[in-house]
Amino acid sequence: MINSKLKNRNLNQVNVFNFSELFKLMKPRVMSLVIFTCAVGLLMAPSTVSTKDAMIAILLVSIGAGAAGALNMWYESDLDALMTRTCLRPIPMGKVNKNQALIFGTSLSFFSVIALDYFANTISAVLLLFTILFYVFVYTIWLKRKTPQNIVIGGAAGALPPVIGWTIATNSLSLEPITFFLIIFFWTPSHFWALSLYKSDDYKKAKIPMLPLTNGIESTKINILVYSLLMLPMVILPYAIDFVGLVFLVPALMLTLYYNILCFELYKFKINKFNPKKAKTIFGYSILYLFLIFVIFLIDKIL
């Protein structure tokens, strides 16, 4: 049970910047995924940049993503205090106040975009700015509390880091990096809806309109299965445009088919009921799945 004292903390009493807690606002685990996918996008590009410039640029992209995360926690601190999964975050715990989070997130946003324009190129900086603005204003402020399609549309922000990695190296956009975007974009719904199934009580407390609460369990299971099946054409697309070879296609299809099987097993459970263990398995596997897909991209290029 969430300690009711969390709701009554006077956050204005936090007057000193606690940098370890500010770092937590940046969602380090999300940042690590951003660093990885951005690096893959950069390494898959036909053009190259120096190792130093590449590392600086990727770091700046991760800082931009962290800034968006901090602004997300600033705006959603009221919801975070209500949910078991998020109640120990810095703002609900009273370790950082909302003004500090706002200043921190805004400052890092400006810094990361301006610095990326200087160290990389304008296209990459514009894409990073769009990512931050989309995540904060479209997903966090507009969609999150209004529609169960929040993560479908909002997933666009999380799908852009590998595209930015590509533009850092090439200073241009083409069809190839769009395949990275589509893979992450269509992966996102099944990943988060699996989480929302076994954490539905949390979302209910916070009155967040996730699909299990608005459309029911059965509809959620169907949507998870449908989006997992949509991953099949998404992993075939890079091969179809001659971006990758069979070294990518074969294992990517195998990983995706196993994902489909897991989602089908979740779907075929009793009507309007679900197996919590299976939902957790899908959520966990989806993270491993995305990581392996991007690893295979690199292996295909090396071989």
From Swiss-Prot:
GO molecular function ontology, one term from the record: protoheme IX farnesyltransferase activity
Superkingdom as given in the UniProt entry: Bacteria
Catalysed reaction equations from the record: heme b + (2E,6E)-farnesyl diphosphate + H2O = Fe(II)-heme o + diphosphate
Signal sequence range: none
Cellular-component GO terms for this entry: plasma membrane
Function according to Swiss-Prot or TrEMBL: Converts heme B (protoheme IX) to heme O by substitution of the vinyl group on carbon 2 of heme B porphyrin ring with a hydroxyethyl farnesyl side group.
Family: Belongs to the UbiA prenyltransferase family. Protoheme IX farnesyltransferase subfamily.
Protein name: Protoheme IX farnesyltransferase
Organism: Pelagibacter ubique (strain HTCC1062)
The encoding gene: ctaB
